[in-house]
């Protein structure tokens, strides 16, 4: 990128000492945004991969389909706690600071995840068991309402305008690393223990082991500095509810930007895996291992998407990626639902690159459309509501649609609907790359 382009965006060149020092802190900024999301999405992934085992332990022994619906219903409950968390923790981020938000969110998530791994079962304490499970999921969802978007805001505000997409993609990368670790851990537990032992107690291992992420994340975030935009927003102490009404347009735009990608992600990398594992228990380890390997494709696609969006423009790329996903989702889902293990891998791989690239650039794009005064609160609320509807409900809706229509390919139309809505919302938008973040 030329110095003239840097001047156009109001930035310094790489020869400036201040800019050089800022670039040296980019790694710490990226790690601070990444680590909390590793923990948060490790838990969400593990819960999805052990859904059938958790259902056996925490719900009455009704039909397998009913247990799966109940388990995925609790999975969705965590997402619906996110909007509440986004308002409370978002207000912390806007009125106190981004650093305080990130420290608080990782502590809440880490403690709730640890407790989930220690809960007594339905056979031990009856109906109190699913109620406690629901409570832990609510706390986790509450914390995630501030964590994901808070870290996106932090990394974007800390980065150069020329590198916002690339640096903020670290937050998105953290989610995939968490999914990879969750998928890999699920495969390792299933490969190391007999199926009855996994069902009885083995599923608890990942939740208890996640305490390592909690400790590392807390120590890392304790040493980060506040962003200049965070200090400015805290000094203004913006009002809460009036700001949500004032920010209605970027809230709607956020839905259009992220809905399809997240619906596709959760169907592809959570629901499809769990369905194949449930229908073919003897091949469960194969599908988990395949899922883990394909997630590496998503991981490496995220910084690529962020980097390209810095060069080409985020709106243009998101429109193109939505069209790609609309074009391949039906064929991809057919491979995931009906194919051999190799067909399953090919189906996931068709979706992996466009999903990864879209997730890598969405963070910076959404941060850029919100005003400074209420950026964390309004953005967190918009993102959380969208993920609750499009992402959190995706496994539940997919399970219901397949059960109702007796057609495993119906979820493709569910994803396509979000894609068409996204195209309609993003088409009239202007490019976001060059927008100043202190406005």
Each language-model region and where it sits:
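Glycine-rich segments within core transmembrane alpha-helices of 12-TM secondary carriers
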Residues: 165-190, 213, 382-394
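Extracellular/periplasmic helix-loop-helix junction of adjacent transmembrane segments
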Residues: 51-84
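Multi-pass alpha-helical transporter architecture, strongest
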Residues: 217-224, 417-439
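Cytoplasmic membrane-interface "Motif A"-like loop-to-helix N-cap segments
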Residues: 95-107, 311-323
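C-terminal ends and interior cores of transmembrane alpha-helices
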Residues: 107-126, 323-339
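Helix-to-loop junctions at the C-terminal end of transmembrane segments
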Residues: 85-98, 301-314
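Extracytoplasmic gate region of multi-pass secondary transporters
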Residues: 48, 248-298, 391-395
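C-terminal transmembrane helical hairpin of 12-TM major facilitator-type secondary transporters
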Residues: 315-362
């Amino acid at each position: 990128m030329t110095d003239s382009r840097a001047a156009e965006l109001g930035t310094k060149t790489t020869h400036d000492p201040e800019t050089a020092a800022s670039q040296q802190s980019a790694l710490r900024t990226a790690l601070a945004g990444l680590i909390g999301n590793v923990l948060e999405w490790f838990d969400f992934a593990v819960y999805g991969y052990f859904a059938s085992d958790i259902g056996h332990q925490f719900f009455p022994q009704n039909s397998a389909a009913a247990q799966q619906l109940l388990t995925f219903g609790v999975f969705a409950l965590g997402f619906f706690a996110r909007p509440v968390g986004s308002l409370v923790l978002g207000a912390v981020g806007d009125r106190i600071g981004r650093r305080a938000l990130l420290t608080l969110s990782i502590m809440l998530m880490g403690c709730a995840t640890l407790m989930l791994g220690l809960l007594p079962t339905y056979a031990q304490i009856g109906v109190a068991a699913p109620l406690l499970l629901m409570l832990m999921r609510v706390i986790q969802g509450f914390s995630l309402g501030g964590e994901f978007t808070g870290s996106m805001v932090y990394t974007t505000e800390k980065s150069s305008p020329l590198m916002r997409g690339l640096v903020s993609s670290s937050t998105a990368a953290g989610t995939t690393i968490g999914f990879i670790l969750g998928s890999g851990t699920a495969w390792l537990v299933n490969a190391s223990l007999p199926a009855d032992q996994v069902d009885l107690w083995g599923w608890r291992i990942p939740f208890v082991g996640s305490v390592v992420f909690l400790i590392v994340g807390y120590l890392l975030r304790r040493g980060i500095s506040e962003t200049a935009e965070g200090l400015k927003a805290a000094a203004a102490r913006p009002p809460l509810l009036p700001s949500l009404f004032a920010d209605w347009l970027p809230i709607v735009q956020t839905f259009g930007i992220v809905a399809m990608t997240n619906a596709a992600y959760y169907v592809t990398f959570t629901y499809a895996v769990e369905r194949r594992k449930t229908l073919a228990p003897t091949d469960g380890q194969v599908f988990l291992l395949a899922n883990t390997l394909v997630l590496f494709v998503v991981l490496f696609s995220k910084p690529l998407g962020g980097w390209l969006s810095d060069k080409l423009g985020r709106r243009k790329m998101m429109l193109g990626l939505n069209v790609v996903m609309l074009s391949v989702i039906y064929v991809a889902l057919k491979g995931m639902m009906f194919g051999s293990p190799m067909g399953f891998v090919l189906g996931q791989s068709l979706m992996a690159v466009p999903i990864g690239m879209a997730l890598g650039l969405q963070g910076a794009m959404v941060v850029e459309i919100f005003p400074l005064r209420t950026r964390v609160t309004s953005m967190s609320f918009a993102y959380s509501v969208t993920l609750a509807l499009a992402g959190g409900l995706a496994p539940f809706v997919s399970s219901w649609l397949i059960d109702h229509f007796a057609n495993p390919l119906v979820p493709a139309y569910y994803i396509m609907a979000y894609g068409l809505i996204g195209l309609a919302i993003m088409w009239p938008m202007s490019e976001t790359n060059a927008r100043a973040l202190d406005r």
